[in-house]
C-alpha cells in the first residue's frame, strides 16, 4: 500500500560500525585491512583477535560438514579427489556487511570484469555484465538415482566434480579480490559466504503437527569481488548468522528445520572450461542424449555449454543439494534460493513452493459526508467486542476504546455511532447520554464488526469524504504465473492507473431537466422475466450499484428498457449517478439547488460545483486502443475507492495445505476439506517497475527512489553535472511526483556527499546492435509493504478477527480464497535477434478451467515475451521449470492434490494483450482483485457463474477447414459478467470491454488459429518429454493419464472428453484412493525417521559440548513429544486432507 506517512523505507545501516567489524574480521583472517581512524581500536584487541582466529581455523560449520559428507559419498565412484568446502571464507554474519565490502571505504564506485557498482544517493547501484537472465540451455543436473528431466541437460558426475574443483580452486585472482580491500597494498583475495535459513513450511498456530514453521538451510559462496550478490541475497532472504556457532546450527533446532541442506557457488570463470577438461566424452563414445544435448566434444577446444551461462545442480532424495552458477546476474542468485526452497518442500511434503503473487483484498467505498454506523455493523455489539478483546484495547470513560498497540491510529467506536464531516464529529450514546469525539484524518475508526471508517482527503479536488473499508476479505492467490503475468500487480494499488477530472455542463437548465426526466422514469418493469421491482433512483433503499445496473443495457432487461437507457446521453448518466451518490433524504427531492455553477462575466459557467467545491470525476485506464499508444479510459463509479490491499505474496511463496478440521477458530470453508496458508519467503521484493518510465505514473517507485538504503540494478547513474543538465528541462522535471523531483533537486544542490544518483524513469543504457537503448529489465529491491507499515498490517488482521467474533487470544487464520493465475499473451512478433515469436492470442481477459484443462495450462505454462528474460514459449510446469531440480511431476502431483483438498477453482487472467489487437499491459491484473473482492463468496464459484450466464464455454472455431476445440480453453467471461460485476466499479460498465475484447477470435481468425496450434503443439511436445524421460511414471493416476493423452491423444482407450477420464479427477475418488493414502504414510515414515535422527544428533552434541546440555535437553523433550504424536494412528487421521509427501523421489533411490 502506497503510504508516505510511515517514514523511511530501509533501516539506515551504521556504516562506521560495519567497517570496524569488517576490519576486525579481516584481521582475524590474517589479512590487511584499509587503514583509517576507526581501525585503531583493532590494535587494542589484537591478542584476542589472534586467539579467535586460531580457534576459528580449527572449526568446521555444521552445515559444511553435512555438505562435505554428501559430496564425499556422492562422488566416491568417480575415483578423483573431492574438493574441500572452503572453511576460511569471510563470513557475512551481520546484516549490511556485504554492502560495506562491495566498495573501497573512500570510493563511490567499483568496476571489475563482471560488475559496475556505484554508491548513489538512494543506496547502491550494481549493473552486472548482463542485464537479464536466459533460460535456454542454462539448467544442468548431475546424474543420480532421481531421473534428470528431459527439459534439463544431464551432466555426468565427473563433469560436476571437476567443475566443483575448478570453482573453488581455479577462481581467477582478480575475481577473489574483496572490493573493500582493493586499495590496500595487498588486497584480500578470498571467498565470501552467507548462511541463510529460508522458510519452506509456514507454521499454523495452534494446530498440532503443523504449528512449527520449518526452514531449510543454505550456505552461499561467492568470489570476493561478487560480494554484492550476497548483499542482494541477504536483502531478500535474511541472514542466519555465523554457521560455525552452535546457536545457529539448524540441526539443533530440529522442529524448525526440514532436515535439508544446500550450497550454492558463484563461478563465472567456469564458462572458459572446455568439455574435455570437464571429462565429457568424445562424440564417438557419447550416448544419444549426450549428443542431443551437446554434452560431448569433437574438437578439444570446445567450451562447456559453448561458453554460455549455466547452472549445474547435484542432488538426490537424501536431502542435500549443491549448485554451481557460472554467472553473477542477481536474478540467478535469487532463483537459486527459490530452487532450494522448492527442493526442500517437495522432499518434505505438506508444503509447496509457489511462483505466486497475492493479497488480502477488502472492498472500499466512498460513504459521502455523513453516515450511520448501524447500517454497516448489524448484528454486532460494542460490549461483546470489548469482552473478546480485553488484551488488545483500552476502554475510555466516554464509551469508546483505543488500541493498546496503536492508540493514536486505531479507535473503536460503538455500533450506534454517527459520523459527520460538517461538524467533524462522531456521536454515540453511552450510559443514556450522547457523547462526541473529534473526527480526524489518518485514524482508523473501527466498528464492532471490523468495518473501518477513515476521514479521507481526495487531494486533487480538496474534497473530504468518509471512506468505508469492509472487514470481509478475499485472499487472491496468483500461483503458476509466468514472467510478466502480473504476480506483483495483483497486490498493487490500482490508484496509479486512476486520474481525476472535473464535471462540466454545456447548458445547466437543459441538462438538469434531462436528469430529472431520468429520475421520474418508472423502472419497476425493467426485467425481461416480468418481475416487478420498485426502484425510484433517489429512494435511499436503492443503492448506487443498483442504479448503475438500471442505467446499463442488459440481457436481463426488456428491449423497451434497454432502448430507453441506451438513448440517454453519457453526460446525463454521469450527472444522474453523481447526484445519486450525493443525495440525502432531507433534501426531499430538491437536488437542483445543491448543484451549482459559478457566474463568469455575468453568465453561468460550465464547471459543476457542490458546496462551492468542483465536482470531481475519476477515470481508470483499461488497456490501449489499437494504435497501442492511446489509452482506453473509463469513468469510475462515484462511490468507488480502490480496494484496501495487504500484500501477502510477490514471487516466492511457501504454502501449506491444512485440514480444516484441525483449525482452532472458524474460517470460510464452505465445507471444504482443507485450506491453503501462505507465507512470503522474501523480506524485500525484486521489483521491475515497468511503468516508472512514464514520469509521475508509478508513485510508489518514485517515492521509493527518493529515500536512501536501496539496492538498485539496471539503471543509468548520473553525476552531479549530468543531473544538473537533466533537471534544466523544467517541464519534464515537474512531470515527476514531488518526492522524486525533490530528490533530484536536492542532489543537484549538493545537499549530500553522494557522487551519483539515478532517476526512476531512466534505465541503464545497454547495447542493442549498433545503438544504445534503455534496459527493459530495470530492478530494485522494495521493502515489503506489510513490514514497512505494521500498523496497516495489524489493522487488516484486526478487522478480520472482529468480523469473525474471535477473541484476541485465539489464532486467526487467513487462508487463500481465490486462485487467479496469470498468463502473458502476445501478437505475432519479431524478437531483437530476428527470431519470429508465434502469437499467443486466444485468451480473453479471464478464463475458468476445469481441472484437466487447468493442469494442461500448468504443465506447459506458456508465455509471451517478457522483459525479465530472453525469449518466449513454455516456462515449464507451474512456471517453475527452469528452477526445479527434481522431476516436475512432484510439483504437479502436489498442485493437483492441493486444488482437490481445498476445493479451489482455477481462474487465469491475461496480461500484456487480449487477442492480438488489444494491448492491456497489467491493467487486467490490477482490475481482477477489485472485482473479486466485491463479489459474494457464492458468486466466485464457477457453477454459479456458468448457471447465470456470466461464464460461457469457449466455442469451437473453424478456420481453413480445420476445427479448433474450445474445450482446451475452458470458459471465459461474458458481456453479462462485465455489465453485472463491472457495475461495482464503472459508471458505464458495458463500454469497458467490447465484444471482440471478450472474444479474441473476432479480432483476427488467422492469428487465433495459429495461436491455438502453437498451444496444441506445445502441449504435445512438453507432455512427450515426461514420457521420454520416464518421469510420467511418477505422476499420480489422473495426472499420468492426462500427460499420456496430451502426448498421444489417448490413454487406455480414454480421451480428454471421456467420462471415465474426467471422473479420475473427482475429489472423493482421489481422497479415497490407495495412492493418496500412501502419501500420508510416506509423510509419517519420513518424519519419524527424521525425528529419531534429530534425537541422535542432539545427544551426540550434548556429549561433545556439555555446556549446551540445559538448552538441548529442552529440545530433546520437545522432539520426543512430537515423535510420540507423529508415530501414532491419530497423526495419520489428523493429516488426512493434507497433501502428505510424494513417495516418488524416494522410490528412485537405490539405497
Swiss-Prot record:
Q: Which residues form a coiled coil?
A: 1083-1129
Q: Which GO terms describe its molecular function?
A: phosphoenolpyruvate carboxykinase (diphosphate) activity
What's one GO BP annotation on this UniProt entry? protein heterotrimerization
The superkingdom listed in its UniProt entry is Eukaryota
- The kind of enzyme this is, by top-level EC class, is lyase
User: Which positions make up the signal peptide?
Assistant: none
What keywords would UniProt list here?
A: Coiled coil, Cytoplasm, Decarboxylase, Lyase
Q: Where in the cell is it found?
A: Cytoplasm, Cytosol
Q: What is its EC number?
A: 4.1.1.38
Catalytic activities: oxaloacetate + diphosphate = phosphoenolpyruvate + phosphate + CO2
Annotated function = Inorganic pyrophosphate (PPi)-dependent phosphoenolpyruvate carboxykinase, which regulates the carbon flow of the central metabolism by fixing CO(2) to phosphoenolpyruvate to produce oxaloacetate. Can also produce pyruvate and diphosphate from phosphoenolpyruvate and phosphate.
Assembly with partners or alone: Monomer and trimer; forms heterotrimers with PEPCK2 and PEPCK3.
Q: What is this protein called?
A: PPi-type phosphoenolpyruvate carboxykinase 1
Which organism is the protein's source? Entamoeba histolytica (strain ATCC 30459 / HM-1:IMSS / ABRM)
Gene name on record? PEPCK1
Amino acid at each position: 500500500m502506497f503510504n508516505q506517512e510511515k517514514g523511511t523505507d530501509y533501516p539506515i545501516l551504521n556504516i562506521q560500525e560495519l567497517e570496524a567489524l569488517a576490519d576486525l574480521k579481516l584481521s582475524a583472517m590474517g589479512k590487511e585491512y584499509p587503514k583509517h581512524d576507526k581501525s585503531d581500536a583493532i590494535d587494542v584487541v589484537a591478542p584476542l583477535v589472534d586467539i579467535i582466529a586460531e580457534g576459528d581455523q580449527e572449526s568446521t560449520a555444521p552445515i559444511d560438514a553435512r555438505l562435505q559428507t554428501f559430496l564425499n559419498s556422492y562422488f566416491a565412484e568417480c575415483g578423483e579427489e573431492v574438493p574441500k568446502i572452503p572453511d576460511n571464507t569471510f563470513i557475512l554474519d551481520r546484516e549490511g556487511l556485504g554492502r560495506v565490502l562491495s566498495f573501497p571505504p573512500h570510493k563511490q564506485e567499483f568496476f571489475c570484469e563482471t560488475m559496475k557498482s556505484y554508491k548513489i544517493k538512494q543506496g547502491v547501484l550494481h549493473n552486472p555484465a548482463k542485464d537479464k537472465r536466459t533460460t535456454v540451455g542454462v539448467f544442468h543436473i548431475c546424474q543420480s538415482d532421481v531421473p534428470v528431466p528431459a527439459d534439463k541437460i544431464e551432466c555426468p558426475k565427473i563433469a560436476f566434480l571437476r567443475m566443483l574443483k575448478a570453482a573453488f580452486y581455479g577462481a581467477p585472482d582478480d575475481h577473489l579480490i574483496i572490493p573493500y580491500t582493493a586499495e590496500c597494498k595487498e588486497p584480500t583475495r578470498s571467498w565470501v559466504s552467507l548462511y541463510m535459513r529460508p522458510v519452506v513450511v509456514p507454521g499454523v498456530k495452534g494446530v498440532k503437527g503443523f504449528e512449527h514453521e520449518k526452514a531449510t538451510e543454505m550456505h552461499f559462496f561467492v568470489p570476493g569481488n561478487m560480494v554484492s550478490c550476497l548483499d542482494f541475497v541477504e536483502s531478500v532472504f535474511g541472514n542466519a548468522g555465523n554457521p560455525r556457532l552452535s546457536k545457529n546450527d539448524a540441526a539443533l533446532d530440529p522442529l524448525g528445520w526440514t532436515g535439508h541442506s544446500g550450497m550454492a557457488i558463484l563461478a563465472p570463470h567456469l564458462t572458459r572450461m572446455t568439455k574435455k577438461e570437464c571429462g565429457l566424452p568424445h562424440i564417438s563414445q557419447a550416448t544419444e542424449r549426450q549428443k542431443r544435448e551437446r554434452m560431448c566434444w569433437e574438437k578439444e577446444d570446445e567450451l562447456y555449454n559453448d561458453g554460455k551461462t549455466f547452472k549445474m545442480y547435484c542432488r538426490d532424495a537424501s536431502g542435500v543439494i549443491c549448485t554451481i552458477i557460472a554467472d553473477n546476474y542477481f536474478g540467478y542468485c535469487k532463483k537459486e534460493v527459490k530452487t532450494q526452497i522448492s527442493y526442500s518442500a517437495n522432499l518434505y511434503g505438506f508444503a509447496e513452493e509457489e511462483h505466486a503473487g497475492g493479497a488480502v483484498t477488502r472492498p472500499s467505498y466512498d460513504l459521502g459526508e455523513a453516515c450511520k454506523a448501524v447500517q454497516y455493523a448489524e448484528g454486532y455489539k460494542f460490549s461483546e467486542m470489548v469482552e473478546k478483546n480485553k488484551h488488545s484495547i483500552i476502554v475510555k470513560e466516554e464509551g469508546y476504546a483505543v488500541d493498546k498497540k496503536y492508540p493514536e491510529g486505531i479507535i473503536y467506536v460503538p455500533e450506534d455511532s454517527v459520523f459527520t464531516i460538517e461538524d467533524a464529529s462522531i456521536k454515540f450514546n453511552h450510559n443514556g447520554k450522547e457523547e462526541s469525539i473529534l473526527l480526524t484524518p489518518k485514524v482508523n475508526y473501527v466498528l464492532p464488526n471490523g468495518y473501518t471508517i477513515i476521514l479521507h482527503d481526495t487531494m486533487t479536488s480538496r474534497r473530504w469524504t468518509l471512506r468505508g473499508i469492509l472487514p470481509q476479505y478475499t485472499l487472491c492467490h496468483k500461483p503458476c504465473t509466468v514472467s510478466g503475468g502480473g504476480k506483483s500487480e495483483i497486490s498493487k494499488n490500482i490508484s496509479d492507473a486512476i486520474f481525476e477530472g472535473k464535471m462540466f455542463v454545456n447548458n445547466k437548465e437543459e441538462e438538469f431537466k434531462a436528469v430529472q426526466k431520468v429520475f421520474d422514469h418508472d423502472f419497476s418493469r425493467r426485467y425481461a422475466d416480468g418481475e416487478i421491482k420498485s426502484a425510484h433512483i433517489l429512494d435511499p433503499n436503492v443503492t448506487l450499484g443498483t442504479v448503475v445496473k438500471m442505467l446499463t443495457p442488459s440481457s436481463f432487461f426488456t428491449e423497451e428498457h434497454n432502448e430507453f437507457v441506451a438513448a440517454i446521453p453519457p453526460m446525463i448518466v454521469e450527472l444522474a449517478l453523481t447526484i445519486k451518490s450525493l443525495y440525502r433524504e432531507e433534501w426531499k427531492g430538491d437536488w437542483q439547488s445543491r448543484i451549482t455553477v459559478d457566474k463568469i462575466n455575468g453568465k453561468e459557467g460550465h464547471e459543476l460545483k457542490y458546496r462551492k467545491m468542483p465536482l470531481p470525476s475519476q477515470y481508470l485506464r483499461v488497456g490501449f486502443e489499437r494504435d497501442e499508444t492511446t489509452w482506453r479510459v473509463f469513468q469510475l463509479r462515484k462511490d468507488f475507492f480502490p480496494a484496501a490491499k495487504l500484500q501477502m505474496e510477490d514471487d516466492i511463496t511457501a504454502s501449506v495445505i491444512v485440514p480444516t478440521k484441525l483449525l482452532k477458530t472458524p474460517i470460510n470453508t464452505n465445507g471444504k476439506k482443507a485450506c491453503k496458508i501462505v507465507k512470503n519467503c522474501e523480506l524485500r521484493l525484486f521489483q521491475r517497475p515497468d511503468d516508472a518510465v512514464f514520469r509521475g505514473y508509478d508513485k510508489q517507485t518514485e517515492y521509493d527512489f527518493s529515500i536512501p538504503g536501496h539496492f538498485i540494478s539496471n539503471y543509468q547513474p548520473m553525476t552531479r553535472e549530468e543531473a544538473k543538465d537533466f533537471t534544466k528541462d523544467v517541464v519534464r522535471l515537474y512531470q515527476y511526483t514531488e518526492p522524486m523531483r525533490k530528490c533530484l533537486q536536492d542532489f543537484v544542490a549538493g545537499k549530500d556527499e553522494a557522487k551519483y544518483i539515478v532517476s526512476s524513469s531512466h534505465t541503464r543504457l545497454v547495447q542493442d546492435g549498433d545503438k544504445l537503448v534503455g534496459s527493459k529489465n530495470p530492478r530494485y529491491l522494495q521493502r515489503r509493504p506489510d513490514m514497512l507499515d505494521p500498523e496497516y498490517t495489524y489493522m487488516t488482521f484486526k478487522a478480520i478477527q472482529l468480523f469473525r467474533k474471535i477473541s484476541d487470544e485465539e489464532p486467526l487464520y487467513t487462508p487463500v480464497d481465490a486462485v487467479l493465475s496469470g498468463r502473458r499473451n502476445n501478437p505475432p512478433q519479431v524478437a531483437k535477434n530476428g527470431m519470429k515469436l508465434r502469437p499467443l492470442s486466444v485468451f480473453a481477459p479471464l478464463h475458468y478451467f476445469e481441472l484437466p484443462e487447468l493442469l494442461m495450462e500448468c504443465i506447459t505454462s506458456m508465455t509471451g515475451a517478457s522483459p525479465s528474460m530472453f525469449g518466449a514459449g513454455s516456462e515449464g510446469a507451474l512456471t517453475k521449470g527452469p528452477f526445479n531440480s527434481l522431476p516436475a511431476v512432484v510439483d504437479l502431483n502436489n498442485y493437483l492434490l492441493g486444488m482437490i483438498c481445498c476445493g479451489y477453482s482455477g481462474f487465469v487472467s491475461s496480461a500484456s494483450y487480449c487477442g492480438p489487437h488489444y494491448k492491456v499491459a497489467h491493467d487486467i491484473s490490477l482490475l481482477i482483485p477489485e472485482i473479486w473482492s466485491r463479489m459474494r463468496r457464492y458468486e466466485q464459484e464457477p457453477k454459479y457463474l456458468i448457471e447465470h450466464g456470466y461464464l460461457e464455454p469457449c466455442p469451437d472455431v473453424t478456420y481453413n477447414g480445420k476445427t479448433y476445440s474450445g474445450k482446451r480453453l475452458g470458459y471465459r467471461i461474458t458481456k453479462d459478467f462485465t455489465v453485472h460485476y463491472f457495475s461495482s466499479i464503472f459508471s458505464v460498465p458495458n463500454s469497458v470491454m467490447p465484444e471482440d475484447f471478450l472474444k479474441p477470435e473476432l479480432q483476427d481468425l488467422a492469428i487465433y488459429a495459429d495461436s491455438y496450434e502453437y498451444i496444441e503443439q506445445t502441449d504435445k511436445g512438453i507432455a512427450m518429454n515426461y514420457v521420454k524421460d520416464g518421469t510420467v511414471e511418477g505422476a499420480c493416476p489422473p495426472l499420468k493419464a492426462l500427460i499420456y493423452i496430451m502426448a498421444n491423444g489417448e490413454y487406455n482407450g480414454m480421451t480428454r472428453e471421456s467420462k471415465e477420464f474426467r471422473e479420475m479427477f473427482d475429489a472423493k475418488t482421489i481422497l479415497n484412493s490407495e495412492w493418496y493414502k500412501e502419501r500420508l504414510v510416506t509423510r509419517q515414515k519420513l518424519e519419524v525417521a527424521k525425528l529419531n535422527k534429530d534425537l541422535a544428533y542432539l545427544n551426540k552434541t550434548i556429549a561433545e559440548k556439555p555446556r549446551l546440555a540445559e538448552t538441548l535437553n529442552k529440545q530433546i523433550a520437545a522432539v520426543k513429544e512430537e515423535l510420540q504424536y507423529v508415530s501414532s494412528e491419530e497423526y495419520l487421521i489428523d493429516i488426512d486432507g493434507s497433501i502428505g509427501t510424494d513417495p516418488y523421489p524416494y522410490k528412485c533411490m537405490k539405497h
